């Protein structure tokens, strides 16, 4: 087959396809005969429906299917022969004029671009590092102790203070009117932990069991309850019970309750450090990977195929609809979500995907089986039964493909960091944990 490719735009191409009418009709006849052997129609026994009746009933739909199949096959063959990397689906239209005995079609489509990655030795990448110090272990230990704290009722004349658990009744009104969520009975919270707004905690702090108090409270403008955000309410609160919190001692008993294999204080701290170091490793990898990807995008030249961008936009819109549906939003499938909201992010994803694919191809950065296995082992190490987790990953090709994609990204990250000008920056454990992504 001689294939003539016409360039319309930067990435847009056109191929004219021709198909013999006889080939189309022969396939239509073949499919109708096959259909006639099994079709059921009133007034006829199965397999005994006359061909002209079958053709009258199903001829149009079968002809449509055959045309789709044959044109699709012809396009795939033509694109392969022309060594074209097609992006998205072609737009195929039948030509008004065709050679005798032929049907002619124009297929307009986009191809994937050539990707030029500039010399990475001139690129700069900031690489973060962080250590797990004793203070991070202490803070984690405090969190674990708080999760296992107990409470004991305080004396009748005791006043509420930080770390106490208080049980209260309260009711709030705005302009003298109650509002949804503004009233509760036997509500418990820990003073000083920020579960309640600061003005609420300040009002309760210093009260005794049995005391009541009224106070004004201003809801922040960005408060999650949109109906009350930015408004001022008047609250009445009554303290019913005050309980002091008691943290467990850091000892062998605490270590044992946490399931530490070496049930000693030293073993507990060592286990915490190991888990924190694993978390630090993954966070650093994610953050440094993002920095590398930003550098790649900034140092690559390519045109974006609109078909790929639109496909990614569609995927993101559907994802947004699914999230709305999960939140219980009515008619989420009909929610007006404009494509343009997601287009910049979709363009970046497509651009990054093409650049990474080219870097992987040009530098043989594909994931090796032993790398995939090592990554799964590392993921499984934090679970109680690592062997079960490993089997879970290897039992599903989709899960393996996800791991393979992560390993490829890690290979790309290591490759770029080995080529670029790396600026090392040390951050504290808390700074790293506070960073997004």
UniProtKB/Swiss-Prot annotation:
Listed Pfam families: FKBP_C, Trigger_C, Trigger_N
InterPro entries documented for this protein: PPIase_dom_sf, PPIase_FKBP_dom, Trig_fac, Trigger_fac_C, Trigger_fac_C_sf, Trigger_fac_ribosome-bd_bac, Trigger_fac_ribosome-bd_sf, Trigger_fact/SurA_dom_sf
GO biological process terms on file: 'de novo' cotranslational protein folding; cell division; chaperone-mediated protein folding; protein transport; protein unfolding
Class in the EC hierarchy, top level: isomerase
Entry's localization field: Cytoplasm
Gene Ontology molecular function: any one: peptidyl-prolyl cis-trans isomerase activity
Keywords: Cell cycle, Cell division, Chaperone, Cytoplasm, Isomerase, Rotamase
Any GO CC annotation of this UniProt entry: cytoplasm
EC number(s) stated in the UniProt entry for this protein: 5.2.1.8
Gene3D superfamilies: 3.10.50.40, Trigger factor ribosome-binding domain, Trigger factor, C-terminal domain
Reaction catalysis annotation: [protein]-peptidylproline (omega=180) = [protein]-peptidylproline (omega=0)
Every PPIase FKBP-type domain range: 163-248
Transmembrane segments: none
Coarse class of the protein's main subcellular location: cytoplasm
Annotated domain remarks: Consists of 3 domains; the N-terminus binds the ribosome, the middle domain has PPIase activity, while the C-terminus has intrinsic chaperone activity on its own.
Entry similarity comment: Belongs to the FKBP-type PPIase family. Tig subfamily.
Summary of the function given for this chain in its UniProt record: Involved in protein export. Acts as a chaperone by maintaining the newly synthesized protein in an open conformation. Functions as a peptidyl-prolyl cis-trans isomerase.
Protein's recorded name: Trigger factor
Lineage: Bacteria, Pseudomonadati, Pseudomonadota, Betaproteobacteria, Burkholderiales
Gene designation per UniProt: tig
């Amino acid at each position: 087959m001689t294939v003539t490719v016409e360039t319309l735009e930067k990435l847009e191409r056109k191929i004219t396809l021709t198909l013999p009418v006889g080939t189309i009709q022969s396939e239509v006849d073949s499919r109708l005969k096959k259909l006639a052997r099994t079709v059921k129609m009133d007034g006829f026994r199965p397999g005994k429906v006359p061909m002209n009746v079958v053709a009258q009933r199903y001829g149009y739909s079968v002809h449509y299917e055959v045309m789709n199949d044959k044109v699709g096959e012809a396009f795939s063959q033509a694109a392969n022969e022309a060594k074209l990397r097609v992006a998205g689906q072609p737009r195929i239209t039948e030509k008004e004029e065709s050679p005798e005995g032929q049907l002619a079609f124009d297929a307009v489509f986009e191809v994937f671009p050539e990707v030029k990655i500039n010399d990475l030795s001139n690129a700069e990448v900031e690489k973060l590092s962080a250590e797990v110090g004793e203070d991070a272990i202490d803070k984690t230990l405090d969190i674990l102790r708080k999760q296992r704290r107990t409470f004991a009722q305080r004396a009748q004349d005791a006043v509420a203070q930080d770390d106490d658990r208080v049980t209260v009744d309260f009711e709030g009104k705005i302009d003298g009117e109650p509002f949804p969520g503004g009233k509760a009975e036997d509500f418990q919270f820990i003073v000083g932990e920020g579960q309640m707004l600061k003005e609420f905690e300040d009002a309760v702090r210093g009260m005794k069991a049995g005391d009541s108090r009224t106070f004004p409270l201003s809801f922040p403008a960005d408060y999650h309850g949109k109906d009350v955000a930015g408004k001022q309410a008047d609250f009445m609160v009554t303290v019913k019970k005050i309980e002091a919190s008691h943290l467990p001692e850091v000892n062998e008993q605490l270590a044992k309750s946490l399931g530490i294999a070496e049930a000693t204080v030293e073993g507990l701290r060592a286990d915490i450090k190991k888990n924190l170091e694993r978390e630090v490793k993954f966070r650093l990898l994610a953050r440094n990977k993002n920095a590398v990807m930003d550098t790649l995008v900034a140092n690559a030249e390519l045109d974006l195929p609109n078909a790929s961008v639109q496909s990614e936009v569609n995927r993101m819109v559907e994802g947004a609809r699914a999230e709305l549906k999960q939140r219980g939003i009515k008619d989420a499938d009909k929610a007006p979500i404009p494509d343009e909201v997601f287009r910049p992010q979709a363009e970046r994803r497509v651009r990054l995907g093409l650049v990474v694919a080219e870097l992987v191809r040009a530098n043989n950065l594909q994931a090796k089986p032993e790398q995939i296995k090592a990554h799964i082992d590392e993921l499984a190490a934090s679970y109680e039964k690592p062997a079960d987790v490993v089997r879970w990953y290897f039992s599903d090709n989709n899960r393996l493909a996800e791991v393979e994609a992560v390993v490829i990204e890690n290979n790309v990250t290591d490759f770029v960091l080995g080529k670029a000008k790396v600026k090392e920056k040390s951050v504290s454990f808390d700074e790293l944990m506070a960073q997004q992504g």
